[in-house]
């Protein structure tokens, strides 16, 4: 936060929400885990929202004959606070992978690891538009160029983030900023 920012800007910044994520990575003793390299789950009784299968993206992502699953379990300080540890989610993820039929009872779990990502995705809630206008207006008034997912406070693909950074650099280097 910028020291001395006006109270309305500080309050607006506090209204901007993002998700946090626990990534659970599982190694399994077979590679035919899914026909899709990524899939989504919107069931409230399943702990993960998205699954990726990294072994399908490159033969170097898992040993021959094995498969890998990366499960994403989402939280947010504003709506669903994270408590406990990332490791607390390993067994619930494996349980739900079995419930979905992606991991069978006779599959051998070769590896399991969990990690916590403090900043995952921008949340597009009803507070976002007005709060963003206030924060961006303040930064514009100070001549501060913002960029990327958390500067623009939007969802961006890698190429869009690069372009956002390029535009911010051009703005920062333009003669009008001097």
Predicted regions and their residues:
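A conserved FAD-binding loop/helix module that cradles the flavin
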Residues: 139, 146-176
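FAD-binding beta-loop-beta segment adjacent to the flavin cofactor pocket
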Residues: 53, 57-64, 105, 116-153
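Short glycine-/acidic-enriched loop or helix-start segments at secondary-structure transitions
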Residues: 1-3, 124, 156-157
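Mid-domain catalytic core of redox enzymes
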Residues: 1-83, 87-88, 92-101
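Active-site-proximal substrate-binding core of FAD-dependent oxidoreductases
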Residues: 107-118, 171-178
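A short, local hydrophobic-aromatic micro-motif
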Residues: 49, 110-111, 142
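C-terminal helical "tail/cap" subdomain of flavin- and related membrane-associated enzymes
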Residues: 87, 91, 101, 112, ...
């Amino acid at each position: 936060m910028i020291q001395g920012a006006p109270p309305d800007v500080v309050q607006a910044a506090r209204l901007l929400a993002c998700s946090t994520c626990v990534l659970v990575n599982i190694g399994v003793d077979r590679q035919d885990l899914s026909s899709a390299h990524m899939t989504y789950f919107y069931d409230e009784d399943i702990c993960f929202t998205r699954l990726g299968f990294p072994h399908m993206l490159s033969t170097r992502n898992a040993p021959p004959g094995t498969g890998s699953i990366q499960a994403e379990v989402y939280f947010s300080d504003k709506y669903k606070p994270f408590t406990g540890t990332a490791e607390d989610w390993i067994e619930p993820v494996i349980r739900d992978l079995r419930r979905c039929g992606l991991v069978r009872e006779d599959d051998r779990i070769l590896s399991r690891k969990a990690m916590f990502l403090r900043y995952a995705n921008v949340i597009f809630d009803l507070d976002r538009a007005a709060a963003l206008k206030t924060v961006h207006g303040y930064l514009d008034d100070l001549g501060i160029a913002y960029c990327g997912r958390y500067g623009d406070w939007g969802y961006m693909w890698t190429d869009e983030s690069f372009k956002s950074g390029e535009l911010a650099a051009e703005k920062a280097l333009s003669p009008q900023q001097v």
